[in-house]
């Protein structure tokens, strides 16, 4: 009886010792990992933070005479509200981009364009450094197979289109068999996509450009590589506003 109790006690003590050893080893491993993380920047997911907001652009209806018809809705430089920016248009029919409004928010609409079109914003006082954790944030809507791509114009004049695409979730309209896209807010990243040269006159995609220098970008914007489909819920895109989070570089 006594020997049995002694055996049980010794077994329990052995198990307790093993458990304590496991805890000590786990704590030691955690401390080693913590020390290595603090000493080795390779353990960090990112070595930088997202740059602050450099500029924001919301559109406005340009001045016009007469009724606000389709012709008077056409975009002009006066559609910009940010005095630090310049408007640049690309494509044979880019002048037919229009300033419209949905739910009280102005947006740019390309439903009447008969060619692919692109639009960029140029900061008058600075190049944009789009390396690292730079972001472009925007509110957009697409209809019927249309998608938006980000574009940049480098300091050397090369116009590039990125491989990222942006399209809206489509929902059925109430009481109709037609679908329409939702306005969504999304972010463009620049260090994780492929880049292709974009013909500034025809707005067609050319050859891929490997490792472009995004540290000095002259213009930033978007392109729709399809012509517009007209009024209603035909193929088109809307862009309500654009925010750019990037570092400024002296021109």
Give short role names for the model-derived ranges.
Residues 7, 16-17, 46-47:
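Compositionally biased, low-complexity segments
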Residues 33-251:
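Beta-rich carbohydrate-recognition modules and glycan-binding surfaces
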């Amino acid at each position: 009886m006594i020997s049995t109790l002694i055996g049980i006690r010794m077994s329990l003590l052995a198990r307790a010792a093993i458990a304590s050893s496991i805890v000590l080893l786990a704590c030691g491993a955690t401390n080693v990992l913590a020390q290595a993380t603090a000493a080795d920047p390779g353990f960090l997911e990112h070595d930088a933070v997202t740059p602050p907001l450099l500029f924001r652009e919301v559109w406005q209806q340009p001045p016009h005479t007469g009724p606000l018809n389709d012709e008077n809705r056409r975009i002009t430089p006066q559609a910009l509200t940010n005095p630090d920016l310049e408007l640049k248009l690309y494509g044979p029919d880019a002048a037919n981009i229009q300033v419209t409004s949905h739910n009280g928010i102005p947006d740019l609409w390309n439903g009447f364009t008969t060619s692919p079109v692109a639009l960029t914003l140029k900061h008058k006082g600075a190049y944009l450094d789009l390396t690292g954790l730079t972001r472009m944030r925007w509110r957009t809507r697409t209809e019927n197979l249309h998608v938006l791509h980000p574009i940049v114009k480098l300091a050397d004049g090369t116009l590039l289109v990125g491989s990222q695409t942006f399209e809206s979730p489509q929902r059925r309209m109430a009481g109709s068999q037609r679908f329409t896209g939702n306005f969504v807010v999304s972010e463009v990243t620049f260090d994780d996509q492929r880049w292709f040269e974009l013909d500034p006159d025809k707005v067609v995609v050319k050859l891929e450009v490997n490792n472009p220098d995004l540290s000095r970008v002259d213009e930033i914007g978007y392109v729709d590589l399809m012509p517009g489909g007209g009024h209603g819920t035909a193929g088109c895109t809307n862009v309500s506003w654009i925010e750019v989070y990037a570092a400024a570089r002296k021109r």
